[in-house]
């Protein structure tokens, strides 16, 4: 893992040295003037500049979790998150949304785990566009269920596939995409995301047009990214790529920020290009209790505990107070979990990919 020195600020752009050891050249701090040119500054880590090959790296997109949510998730926004199905759910970002008391949000996701339930329970959500909301380990999500029963939440039912189509249409810049997927189901009843059409090539062929979705912001969790937002991710993508490309703004939360050379060394794993990204947040264990392949496994006990401790509104409020409001940030959250619990979630059986040669 990279070792980070203290950040330095020069003008309006921050820089810091990232030392990845002998295989990667260290990155040195610099200043940037109004014309975007770089000038090497004094090293803030002794010996880090003793190399013929220096790299400049802009920190303009790097944010704390607090600042990223404050800047890019306004009240009333439509927010796509949890797009990778049951893994890499951006819980840390969701908890920061709760801490900042965001209101009137529209939550967008496929089969959506307990993060949606927490956001609903905290009063952040006004609408939900999803295929399912619940606790993947236990079934029902009590805050969501109660809100629906009391007509306190507007819900638009989707399937995983029709949600993918809606986001893909948004990414393509077209108003809809056709499908046969929802034919003969109740998914479309009272749902303005579906409109019956007929094929222009086979006039008697009935189809459903799925309305495009363009989230105001998409939040994703990945294994690693550079400071410009170019992100490596492996494992189940779910509908993450569609959600990123359809969004007006994108926040990438990464387990670690690495040098650009690390990202460019494996271009096929760079599934999110930096030009789509507005903010990059480094947040270790930011997806807990969901798993991140290669970093940590699912905390099954946490899902069981959440199920047992949130059956009633007053119990849910206590849980949110204990795990969100009274926890200053993700580091405090991890400390509350405890070292033993974190260590127990470490990768037990590594499954390394074969090395690829990109040479000619």
Q: Residues of each region from the PLM?
A:
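Basic polycationic patches enriched in arginine
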Residues: 7-9, 16, 54-55
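Conserved alpha/beta enzyme-core scaffold
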Residues: 58-360
